[in-house]
């Protein structure tokens, strides 16, 4: 019984340490960085983030707007309605241009905003893709070009500069976001099983908590038995 008791405690401690380390990696891998960005040519900001593994930046701009009306597309922010051609998408309403220069680790690349691709309660989002200087304003390569920049692992600082912004958006402040490497819907295969924590994290935490409660109850019963045995021995003497 004593061996089983201490083995169970050792297993609980090992599982707790393992889960804590996995959750720390999960928090880093799912870290979403964001900052307000004034849309004026020449505006600069430094975006701080952390990554568990190297990867390519996925940038987006979120605007405070009501959900889009697909019957009356917003000419400023654009609309995702498009026609697909060989190697590219042609958008009916691409939105006014936004180009950002991203600098990291001595390298830089220009990114171009696509039309509104998602929306939530009171906000809409435009995602960025590597710029194609010779492309028509309505055309975007599809699948998108591979990002020319690669972000390393650890704590990072990205310098962002507004290169171009359409007149209908100048002076507006939007939220610049840098997506994490590990996401619920889209993730890199290098993260392996860590993606499963999106689904099983609450269950694992609950099971470990129940295991701890059982061990505490078992320890209390063993302690009470030990004290009773000691008290009986004292009386007998």
Descriptions of predicted regions:
Residues 41-56, 145-156:
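Extracellular and analogous surface-interaction loops
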Residues 193-237:
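Juxtamembrane interface at the cytosolic side of transmembrane helices
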Residues 23-44, 175-182:
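Alpha-helical transmembrane signal-anchor/signal-peptide segments
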Residues 63, 71-119, 174-180:
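Extended low-complexity, serine/threonine- and proline-enriched intrinsically disordered segments
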Residues 149-185:
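Extended, hydrophilic extramembrane loops/domains of integral membrane proteins
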Residues 174-204:
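C-terminal interaction-tip segments
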Residues 25, 33, 98-151:
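Extended, solvent-exposed segments with strong compositional bias
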Residues 2-23, 211-212:
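Hydrophobic membrane-insertion alpha-helices, especially the h-region
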């Amino acid at each position: 019984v004593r061996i089983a008791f201490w083995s169970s405690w050792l297993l609980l401690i090992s599982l707790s340490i393992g889960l804590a380390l996995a959750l720390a990696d999960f928090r880093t891998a799912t870290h979403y960085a964001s900052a307000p960005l004034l849309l004026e040519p020449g505006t600069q900001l430094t975006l701080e983030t952390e990554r568990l593994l190297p990867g390519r930046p996925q940038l987006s701009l979120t605007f405070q707007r009501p959900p889009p009306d697909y019957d009356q597309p917003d000419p400023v922010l654009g609309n995702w309605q498009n026609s697909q051609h060989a190697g590219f998408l042609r958008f009916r309403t691409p939105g006014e241009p936004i180009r950002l220069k991203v600098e990291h680790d001595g390298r830089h690349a220009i990114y171009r905003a696509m039309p509104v691709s998602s929306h939530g309660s009171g906000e809409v989002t435009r995602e960025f893709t590597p710029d194609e200087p010779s492309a028509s304003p309505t055309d975007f390569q599809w699948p998108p070009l591979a990002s020319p920049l690669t972000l390393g692992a650890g704590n990072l600082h990205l310098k962002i500069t507004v290169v171009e912004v359409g007149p209908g958006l100048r002076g507006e402040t939007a939220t610049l976001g840098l997506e994490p490497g590990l996401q619920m819907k889209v993730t890199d295969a290098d993260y392996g099983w860590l993606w499963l924590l999106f689904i099983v994290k609450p269950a694992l935490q609950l099971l470990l908590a129940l295991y701890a409660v059982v061990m505490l109850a078992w320890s209390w019963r063993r302690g009470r038995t030990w004290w009773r045995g000691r008290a009986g021995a004292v009386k007998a003497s």
